[in-house]
């Protein structure tokens, strides 16, 4: 496990991280990840503070396949098949492997599994930046290159077209104990990433005690589970 901050001027392409069964074919592991947008790191929203997730419920696999076939013919219009969400500071999203996502331009704290598998399914970005075709086939087994059905199979279809995607994937901070109880002790500790079965993150009480609590200065603590809780890395 590891965590990072990414802070892009504009949005990233609608892309995907492979699930275990597809990643294993190229000797890798699947990559779950989560996002959190800390207010203290975002004095500027960048060019596009919206993120696209998944696909519209009425989109068919054939439509996605056709868009992927048009990757080298200009804008393949994949984003027209997806929903965008305005990003809200001090909230986050769960992004399971197999879910298409085009991250927006807020500075983002990202706890994730230590894997680098991905493929870019969108050909032309905001600002007319283009994506090269080799990234469409990134981490595809050699024998599957050119097989657009394989690219569609990489998509976790049920999760992408989930009509309750926001309900299942959006994460608002959750106090670990009653707020009144923690305020009496001079700090507030919150879970900020908690819907992934592999990795989670919270604001740590010991650092809040040491530095003094300030709701605008969350410090981020990464854990790995199941099993015993284990601290992996601190970002501040």
What are these regions (language model features)?
Residues 1-89, 99-236:
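Active-site region of the double-stranded beta-helix
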């Amino acid at each position: 496990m590891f965590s990072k901050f990414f802070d892009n001027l504009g949005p990233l392409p609608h892309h995907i991280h492979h699930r275990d069964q597809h990643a294993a074919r190229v000797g890798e592991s699947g990559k779950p990840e989560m996002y959190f947008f800390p207010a203290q790191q975002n004095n500027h929203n960048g060019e596009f503070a919206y993120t696209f997730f998944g696909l519209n419920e009425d989109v068919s696999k054939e439509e996605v396949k056709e868009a992927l076939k048009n990757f080298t013919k200009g804008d393949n219009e994949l984003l027209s098949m997806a929903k965008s969400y305005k990003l809200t500071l001090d909230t986050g999203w769960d992004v399971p492997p197999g879910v298409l996502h085009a991250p927006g331009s807020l500075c983002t704290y990202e706890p994730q599994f230590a894997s680098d598998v991905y493929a870019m399914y969108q050909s032309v970005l905001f600002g007319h930046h283009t994506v090269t075709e080799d990234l469409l086939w990134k981490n595809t087994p050699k024998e599957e290159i050119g097989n657009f059905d394989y690219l569609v199979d990489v998509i976790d279809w049920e999760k992408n077209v989930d009509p309750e995607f926001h309900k299942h994937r959006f994460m608002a901070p959750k106090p670990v104990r009653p707020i009144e109880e923690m305020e009496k002790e001079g700090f507030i500790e919150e879970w900020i990433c908690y819907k992934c079965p592999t990795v989670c993150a919270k604001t740590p009480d010991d650092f809040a005690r040491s530095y003094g609590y300030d709701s605008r200065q969350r410090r981020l603590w990464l854990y790995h589970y199941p099993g015993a809780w284990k601290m992996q890395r601190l970002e501040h």
